[in-house]
């Protein structure tokens, strides 16, 4: 395929234009009076959302050069979402403003490398000030406030998330799923989460969120590594006959075995996900046993004389109501009404409590307490309903955003919301030292850019940006801000308008990181437009060996 190359000013102009297209679409969602965006789906009704990263990821521009710019800002939103779980719109708005201001400096002939150094110093100083003024989340009401703000002012969402955290603890497991009725409910069920995700992204059933979700799966627990597929064939055939999915938790899965599982998963011969077992050494064996008790299954281990190739039915496999696997975590949700499992779990918890009493190692005691918490506290499930499928999905998006924001707040604390944390933090730049005048330009650019979130929130509310910015500039109270819902100046903390420190910090860091890359770019290479319309390419699949087995499956 032939390529086209764009250099210099024309290159940067196209990139900035592409960034601006995405930023305009994402920016309108910011704040309590931000608007929703309708995203066309490949089938069914459109997706209605205020989630910045969902809006950004949905954008694919026809002009290849503009699309390069769009991808820059999409990467900002995605990275911020991955790290903080929220703040993607703020990051996008800041990145757009930073790129435009940095480009003005370069066009004016100022040494852009020195400008970047000054801007980098400014970002570090602002983040330090934000952290210094952060307050820890102290109670259920503050948790509810964070969740309410992040869910676009939906107090019910805030209260439900706070209630869920109260029941399972601030570090407990909380999942979000569709309700079968109109209501929004919190239910605590038996289950656990451990810090291991899928071995390959090809197992993801939801490509947009890159997660695997299985309803009523079988769970195969292996205390061994699997490299060849042949020992797995009997149990895979047994599960395939039931039509249910399979969660395989093992020391590791690689080589031929991994290839065959991916191939059959993609073909739909059997729904399967492979996950590495949590822990190491003896602790791994104990955690596998914990999972076995919770799922009413057995750990397949040759130490007990059980060989994998001899497992040819589902009798030794565990079960669960639901399993959710991401790249980092696996969550198992079980029926809380199963009395047999309840008894086994209680007995197992008592064993762990005795082990805690007997150990003299602080480290060992900590790990035992973690295991006890996983078994005892269960999983809080937020069941989100709605009058229509579109309404339900939109609300579910807001619940997930609010949950991410709440976790970030618990982790690093909270600061005044509405964009004022960054706005007031910019005052530290007035006394920041610089090596030359070009660096001072960079510092002043960041000072101006930090007004962008406040301006966007006011703009979306139909207010006058300059008037609000001017009014806040006169204030000596760092908690004073503009409540876009009431169009009044208030004490943001007292009004319950707060942002997680981690979200604010990450948004600024990621935005500046991408803005720096953009301004350092002087050429781009894209496909020629006419080449994109010539014929269809057949995508390569995942190869796999054929070693016999049931029809329709590749082993």
Curated annotation (Swiss-Prot):
Signal peptide: none annotated. It catalyses: ATP + H2O + a folded polypeptide = ADP + phosphate + an unfolded polypeptide. It is found in: Cytoplasm. One of its GO terms (molecular function) is ATP binding. The keyword Oxidoreductase does not apply. Residues 528-555 are annotated as: Disordered. Keywords: ATP-binding, Chaperone, Cytoplasm, Isomerase, Nucleotide-binding. ATP binds at residues 29-32, 50, 86-90, 418, 499. Residues 537-555 have a biased composition (Gly residues). Belongs to the chaperonin (HSP60) family. InterPro entries: Chaperonin_Cpn60_CS, Cpn60/GroEL, Cpn60/GroEL/TCP-1, GroEL-like_apical_dom_sf, GROEL-like_equatorial_sf, TCP-1-like_intermed_sf. CDD domains: GroEL. PANTHER family: 60 KDA HEAT SHOCK PROTEIN, MITOCHONDRIAL (PTHR45633). HAMAP family: CH60. It is an enzyme of class 5 (isomerase). SUPFAM superfamilies: GroEL apical domain-like (SSF52029), GroEL equatorial domain-like (SSF48592), GroEL-intermediate domain like (SSF54849). Its EC number is 5.6.1.7. This is Chaperonin GroEL. Forms a cylinder of 14 subunits composed of two heptameric rings stacked back-to-back. Interacts with the co-chaperonin GroES. Together with its co-chaperonin GroES, plays an essential role in assisting protein folding. The GroEL-GroES system forms a nano-cage that allows encapsulation of the non-native substrate proteins and provides a physical environment optimized to promote and accelerate protein folding. GO terms for biological process: protein refolding.
